[in-house]
């Protein structure tokens, strides 16, 4: 939930104390809140973002925040309330941007910005799923009263006189009605109308500021210049070096990105039909491009996996009749899963499609086991297909049910984890669990029917050489496997020692593997921030920005460069900053390079600009979690720590962090040395002369910072009226000599006689995190290191070099990674516990489940070794894969344990029963495992968007 307010003319410190503090005191502790962060800037702007848990209801959260802000309003400055406080619920990342451009010089940036507001913005806001539409770098119309302080003083007027005249003569008022009841003898009533609010610059110029006793009149045009122009010039936006009105589209939480984007594009096609000649629009940035490309790649992988699984099944069963039975289970299970996804409210996204790809290799398992067992009985006992099927199902039904329910026992509990991690697990695990259950239903119903109808006894015809070689290899492998099993089973102590070594190896490798939350993806764009010396004007920043844009446009891999000059995601509104969003060409047009190589080249070239510092960043892996990829650390001034202590701590941390090779892209949000002019008011003298202290401050604010007076009507809308001194009167410290206030006796008193002005420095913006003044440290792990390692190093530096009154917290993606960091153990514990409890209930035994559980660590060791050898990280996807692997290992173990238990119950020897079960189940287990592995192979080899 985002909160925005403004206190024009106020410094960052004033905004922090007068606006941020009372609002945050009320907001703190809102139910479901994870953390809140705010920014107060020297432009008078205040913005706060309250981040809630994914389980929170966004509507209730926004209402709760709104109610709490109402409680804070009594402690806020009147001008802040007059300007309005907005509370909006939205997904925190942009879905897309729309740029209105024109090659006609009459359509300047002010016209484009207001055309977009009047004719485009409101229509887009009404699209279902759109949370907010922001006019970035807006140039909203306003009636600017450019006052001339020297002329006002010559006439004996002050800025308060101007404000009073505007408030008196530019107002809406009801004039009454002729013939309103109770009256008699009238047939009609007539409303009385009059000129209320003014609507043109000419009308404002004619406002009477003072009528003199001699009959002369001083009008507004005598002491000020009036013009209709932009309300603010603090930021500006553009596309590819040209001025443009840039609209940022934000979704409502929970809305479907693809659907919202499609509706926005359709709406823009209709709206653009009414554009004036010479005006057009572009959509340079569209997050759904990455989403659709990723899903397209997954669809390809899905098809490739299906082909490979069918091929493996055919080579294993060696008959098109037998192959048809497991293959039929795939579409039935997947189509059924789609139905349940609809019931659960899931969408087709990367996680659910990943679940479906993995499910392809699993849903054939049960049917393969049925077919293989039926064919084995037909061959060894010479039974008819019907009799063989009947006998096979008598022995298999309970095992099939047990294996499927064990898989569900693995997946379902994990889906109840909280937070973002639980949300990621939930869609994946439930998708697989449903597909597995449906495949079991197919294996228990349709597969036996098909076996009895289409399978044929072996005709004795010699098989082709490929099948013979496969069978020969399988027989040899089975024979060697049984030989190893027979020898190993005679040495239980050695076996348990080896098992202990497996556990130790898992523990060691788990500690050595670097951790992260999610792998970094090429999302098709990156951001560049230009930082000029503090106090630089927008004109100076614009020159450097234009130069950088021209350079980036020459890059063959760049499609668009979108710029917002005068703003930065790290520090907010600041004329010495510029943010460039570099949108790359489609992935297929840059296959011979990577986004990292492109960024390295850009960073190297832009660092040659002596006028500025350059920071490059990739977007966060999960849109909206943080301002960029990498880590986001909050250094907090706690206890009695001052802003100066925080600056010193941030400098210390940055000093040691920049020495570490594991870290890169380090930057701090602190702006501590911004040039400022301090006016030291002589309060005794002010009181002696009878000058209201409020007039001293309001005069200075109105002339140098602008003051909002009231509103006027135009284009069926309401716009604001501002007073500010003309540019030549607010360029230098000496201009304050021309600012006058009235003493109690009516004499005009210059402000310079009431205080001294001197240059100093102070913060340009003040950030707060959970009510503490904070410095945001951004950075990322260097090539070859993980985000988890980078975060550990930052925490280590903080522990060793920062004082006790400086606290450390994480936000954005780093917060979620830290929260999920200890969940691997929890996930595996849940999995093992539920498998054990389920099997104990299934077999009514505490010992039988142990046989299944003992096989699981061996499978987990293979996963850990694979990740370690390939240089991968322990992230959410690894944990998902580990859960999947444990489930499959348990399923395979049950096939052996179930058969062995039946033989033991029938009087068989324990050891021989186990060996016989392993021999009999070797082929189906090998076939199903091979089908699953090859089903995943296309995912392993995939490239392009979403492949990480």
Residue ranges and their predicted role:
Residues 134-141, 146, 222-225, 236-311, ...:
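Juxtamembrane "pre-transmembrane" interface segments
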Residues 3, 124, 428, 857:
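Structured binding elements
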Residues 396, 465-519, 919:
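Signature of alpha-helical transmembrane segments and their immediate interfacial
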Residues 18-35, 49-141, 160-174, 193-232, ...:
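Surface-exposed amphipathic alpha-helical segments in non-transmembrane regions
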Residues 361, 392-395, 402-463:
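Hydrophobic alpha-helical segments
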Residues 1-11, 33-34, 70-80, 346, ...:
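Transmembrane helices with small-residue packing motifs
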Residues 284, 291, 295, 371, ...:
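Helix-loop junctions and hydrophobic alpha-helical segments within the transmembrane domains
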Residues 2, 307-316, 320-376, 416, ...:
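Hydrophobic transmembrane alpha-helices and their membrane-interface caps
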């Amino acid at each position: 939930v985002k909160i925005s307010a403004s206190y024009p003319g106020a410094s960052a410190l004033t905004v922090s104390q007068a606006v941020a503090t009372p609002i945050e005191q009320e907001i703190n502790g809102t139910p479901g809140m994870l953390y809140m962060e705010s920014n107060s800037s020297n432009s008078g702007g205040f913005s706060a973002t309250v981040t809630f848990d994914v389980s929170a209801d966004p509507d209730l959260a926004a209402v709760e925040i709104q109610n709490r802000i109402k409680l804070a309003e009594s402690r806020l400055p009147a001008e802040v309330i007059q300007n309005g406080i907005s509370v909006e619920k939205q997904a925190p990342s942009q879905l897309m941007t729309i740029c209105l451009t024109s090659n006609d010089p009459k359509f300047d940036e002010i016209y484009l910005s207001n055309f977009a507001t009047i004719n485009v913005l409101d229509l887009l806001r009404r699209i279902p799923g759109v949370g907010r539409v922001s006019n970035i770098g807006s140039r909203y119309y306003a009636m600017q009263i450019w006052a001339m302080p020297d002329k006002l003083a010559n006439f004996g007027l002050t800025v308060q006189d101007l404000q009073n005249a505007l408030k008196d003569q530019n107002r809406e008022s009801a004039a009454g009605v002729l013939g309103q009841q109770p009256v008699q003898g009238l047939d009609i009533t007539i409303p009385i109308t009059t000129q209320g609010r003014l609507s043109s610059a000419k009308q404002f110029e004619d406002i009477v500021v003072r009528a003199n006793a001699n009959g002369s009149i001083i009008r507004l045009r005598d002491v000020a210049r009036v013009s209709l122009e932009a309300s603010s010039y603090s930021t500006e936006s553009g596309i590819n070096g040209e001025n443009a009105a840039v609209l940022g589209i934000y979704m409502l939480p929970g809305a479907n990105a693809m659907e919202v984007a499609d509706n926005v594009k359709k709406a823009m096609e209709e709206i653009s039909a009414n554009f004036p000649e010479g005006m057009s629009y572009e959509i340079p940035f569209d997050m759904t491009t990455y989403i659709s490309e990723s899903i397209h790649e997954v669809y390809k992988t899905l098809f490739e996996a299906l082909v490979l699984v069918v091929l493996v099944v055919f080579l294993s069963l060696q008959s098109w009749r037998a192959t048809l039975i497991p293959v039929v289970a795939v579409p039935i299970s997947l189509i059924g899963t789609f139905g349940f996804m609809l019931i659960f409210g899931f969408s087709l996204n990367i996680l659910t499609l990943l679940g479906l790809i993995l499910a392809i290799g699993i849903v054939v398992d049960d049917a393969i086991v049925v077919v293989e067992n039926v064919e084995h009985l037909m061959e060894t006992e010479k039974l008819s297909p019907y009799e063989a099927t009947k006998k096979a199902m008598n022995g298999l039904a309970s095992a099939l049910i047990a294996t499927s329910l064990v898989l569900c026992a693995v997946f379902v509990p994990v889906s109840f984890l909280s937070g973002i991690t639980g949300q990621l697990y939930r869609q994946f695990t439930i998708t697989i669990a449903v597909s597995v259950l449906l495949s079991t239903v197919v294996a228990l119903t349709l597969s036996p029917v098909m076996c009895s109808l289409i399978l044929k006894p072996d005709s004795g015809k010699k098989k082709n050489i490929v099948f013979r070689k496969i069978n020969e290899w399988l027989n040899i492998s089975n024979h060697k496997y049984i030989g190893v099993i027979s020898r190993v089973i005679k040495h239980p102590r050695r076996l348990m020692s080896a098992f202990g070594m497996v556990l130790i190896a898992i523990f060691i490798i788990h500690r050595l593997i670097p951790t992260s939350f999610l792998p970094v993806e090429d999302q098709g764009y990156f951001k560049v921030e230009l930082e000029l010396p503090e106090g630089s004007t927008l004109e100076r920043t614009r020159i450097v920005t234009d130069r950088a844009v021209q350079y980036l446009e020459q890059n063959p891999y760049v499609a668009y460069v979108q710029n917002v000059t005068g703003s930065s995601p790290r520090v907010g509104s600041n004329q010495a900053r510029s943010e460039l969003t570099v949108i790359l060409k489609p992935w297929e047009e840059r296959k011979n390079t990577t986004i990292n190589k492109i960024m390295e080249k850009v960073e190297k070239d832009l660092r040659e600009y002596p006028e500025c510092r350059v920071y490059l960043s990739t977007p966060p892996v999960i849109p909206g979690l943080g301002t960029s990829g990498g880590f986001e650390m909050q250094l907090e001034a706690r206890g009695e720590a001052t802003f100066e202590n925080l600056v010193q701590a941030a400098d210390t941390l940055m000093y040691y962090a920049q020495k570490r090779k594991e870290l890169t892209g380090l930057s701090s949000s602190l702006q501590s040395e911004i040039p400022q002019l301090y006016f030291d008011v002589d309060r005794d003298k002010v009181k002696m002369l009878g000058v209201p202290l409020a007039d001293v401050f309001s005069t200075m604010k109105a002339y140098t910072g602008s003051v909002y007076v009231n509103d006027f009507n135009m284009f069926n809308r309401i716009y604001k009226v501002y007073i500010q001194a003309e540019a030549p009167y607010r360029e230098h410290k000496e201009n304050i000599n021309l600012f006058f206030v009235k003493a109690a006796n009516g004499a005009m008193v210059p402000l310079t006689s009431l205080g001294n002005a001197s240059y100093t420095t102070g913060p340009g913006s003040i950030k707060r995190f959970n009510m503490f003044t904070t410095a945001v440290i951004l950075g990322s792990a260097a090539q070859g290191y993980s985000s988890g390692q980078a975060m550990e190093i930052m925490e280590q530096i903080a522990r060793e070099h920062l004082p006790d009154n400086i606290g450390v917290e994480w936000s954005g993606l780093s917060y979620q990674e830290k929260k999920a960091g200890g969940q691997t153990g929890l996930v595996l514990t849940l999995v093992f516990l539920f498998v054990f409890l389920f099997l104990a209930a299934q077999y009514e035994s505490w010992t039988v489940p142990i046989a299944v559980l003992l096989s699981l660590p061996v499978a987990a060791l293979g996963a850990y070794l694979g990740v370690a050898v390939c240089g991968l990280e322990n992230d959410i996807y690894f944990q998902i894969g580990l859960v999947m692997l444990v489930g499959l290992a348990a399923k395979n173990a049950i096939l052996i344990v179930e058969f062995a238990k039946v033989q033991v119950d029938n009087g068989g020897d324990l050891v021989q029963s186990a060996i016989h079960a392993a021999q009999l189940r070797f082929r189906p287990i090998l076939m199903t495992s091979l089908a699953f592995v090859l089903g995943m192979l296309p995912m392993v080899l995939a490239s392009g968007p979403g492949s990480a």
